[in-house]
Amino acid sequence: MAPAMRPAAFLVAALCCAATAHASPIPSDAASVGRYFSYDNAAADATVDLIGQAQRRVLLAGYAYVPPAVAAALRAARSRGVDVRVVLVRSSRAGKYSGAGFLKSAGIDVAIDSRHGDPAPRFVIVDDSVALTTLSDDAAAHAETVNVFQRAPELAQSYAQSFWRLYRQAGGL
């Protein structure tokens, strides 16, 4: 597959993983889509910015580890009274740091799914917005793409259903 097609192929695969995402149009004229690609921190910054906008909930799933900036944003959201829950995927590639202890010490509910290996769809739901993250095949480059769908409540609901399924499978609830 051509490198330019990989992000689009992942997006299609990720949308199919959500129970009804393929049938959920972005309903609002106010909805927007942003795409961030980088070899530096621009993609992570987009995720941090989205979490910073949270008012009610943040659900994060599919990460083998939580990047420190994202973990700090999750803790800040929790301290503002936002309901924050995380499902991490156990991975031998995560190394010693996963962020789980850091998040748990802030009172964030963290479930670890040891049944699934890499790759897993990585997504963050913030109120009625969704961010989908893909990593480059070149692990050494640490490149990632983040697609952010803002003000997309039906898409967020579809991914929330997937989150709660993953959460239950990981032993949460």
Residue ranges and their predicted role:
Residues 8-18:
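Bacterial N-terminal signal peptides
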Residues 20-22:
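Sec/Tat signal peptide C-region and signal peptidase I cleavage site
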Residues 24-46:
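Short N-terminal segments immediately surrounding and downstream of signal-peptide cleavage
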Residues 24-26, 125-126, 130-173:
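Signature of lipid phosphatidyltransferase scaffolds
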Residues 36, 87, 109-113:
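General small-molecule cofactor/ligand-binding pocket signal
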